[in-house]
Amino acid sequence: LGDSLGLSQEAGKTDARIIVFCGVHFMAETAAIISPDKKILIPALGAGCSLAESITGYELREWKKANPDGIIVSYVNTTAEVKAWTDICCTSANALKVVQSIPPDRKILFVPDKNLGAWIRKVTGREMELWHGDCCVHERITTDMILEKSRDYPQADILIHPESHCSHDEAILNLPQAYMYSTAGMIRHASRSDKKQFIIA
């Protein structure tokens, strides 16, 4: 049990030669990249992800042609083809540090998650070109939904993933009980907190 990269890393640590990856296609690809000597099986070959499917390697190649000095930063939730055209691959946990490490005179294309990119841009003030991709589930999590749940459960901590539509809205970010986390960070917070209720965005 874990997030996409965490599961792929666990696959790399095990002595098993065959890994059955119960997830979407890009996750199994990532496991295969990390463990090229192992056989990675996915039960449903057609299991897709709207975020990963929002961009292709061809589109990145064309951007690179037009911006030869630009830096492509891709979220780990991408296909192997997209990773191949990527300069730096990041996770939601280290995306801020990755963007901050790039010289200010270099143009950045952040792909494919527009919400994660918008949150990074808001926090760092760094101008970036954002791809217009999203997770179809996270995109439906709006500020109004979270504020309503917060009124219903006033004692609950709000744990926000930067993929969520509400992740770069001041109305949420300014709440004292709101925390921005990767999936693994959410799990850690919930396990260590004295709170009994959590709103997950």
Residue ranges and their predicted role:
Residues 1-201:
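Active-site loop-to-helix "anion-binding N-cap" substructures in soluble metabolic enzymes
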